[in-house]
Amino acid sequence: MTGLEEWFESPIGRYLIEQEQAYFDQNVGDVFGYHAVQLGVPGFDFLRTSRMQLKVRAGPDLALDFFNMPFDSGSIDLAVLPHLLEFSCSPHQILREIERVVRPEGRIILSGFNPFSLWGLRRLATQSVAEPWCGNFISLSRMKDWLALLGFEVSAGRLCCYAPPFDQEKWLNRFAFMEKAGDRWWPISGGVYFLVAIKRVKGLRLIRPNWGINAALAPPVSELNKPRCRKSK
């Protein structure tokens, strides 16, 4: 068990992991394809609601070098990254490798700690060497910039964990009202953010059937099949 996974057993960790699990459960089930991989926090199954045929969790299922993954280019339909990048010495390099293995129009879903929040303030104040406070929290705007540079388009996202990061459960319960109020009154100050991003490739356009106005204006099949005769002059 990693230090972060041990922290998830604490009251504040459980407060976070319940919301993370709910978000991943809701979003991975809507992604279609054949191959899904979870990179990070291997002690929790964030792919459990995915309907893909092959689901791999780095750690219990497969030991991975995140900088050189044993997947073919463009072979992954969904990559889930729970708190992977903020505990890496080279997060942008990992993102480059993920961009390589994800197929065009494939998706990544990631979570990260928000440095511009009460949780970020605690990290600065404590200067702890324990996870998660020792991590390099990456801002939401910087993460979006990195994704855009690699050709990913952010399609959805949200923040959560607006309550102060108390270690005691009684204090978390007293500030539970902030969770519902946060989305309305201070939506960018949640302690944790989620992003869903789609890999876009220049020049690639999905062809969809056109059942709109052109189909409505087309003549009936019976008219098309009728023999046509010329009038004699």
Per-region residue spans from a language model:
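Short alpha-helix
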Residues: A125, C134-G157
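Class I SAM-dependent methyltransferase SAM/SAH-binding core
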Residues: A22, Q26-D72
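A short glycine-rich, Lys/Arg-flanked "PGG" loop and its adjoining helix->strand segment in the class I
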Residues: H92-R107
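Conserved catalytic loop of SAM-dependent methyltransferase domains
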Residues: V154-E179, I188-S189
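C-terminal lobe and adjacent flexible extensions of AdoMet/dcAdoMet transferase-like proteins
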Residues: F177-K233
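Hydrophobic beta-strand segment of the Class I
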Residues: I76-V80
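Conserved class I S-adenosyl-L-methionine
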Residues: R107-F137
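Class I SAM-dependent methyltransferase Rossmann-like catalytic core
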Residues: M1-G29
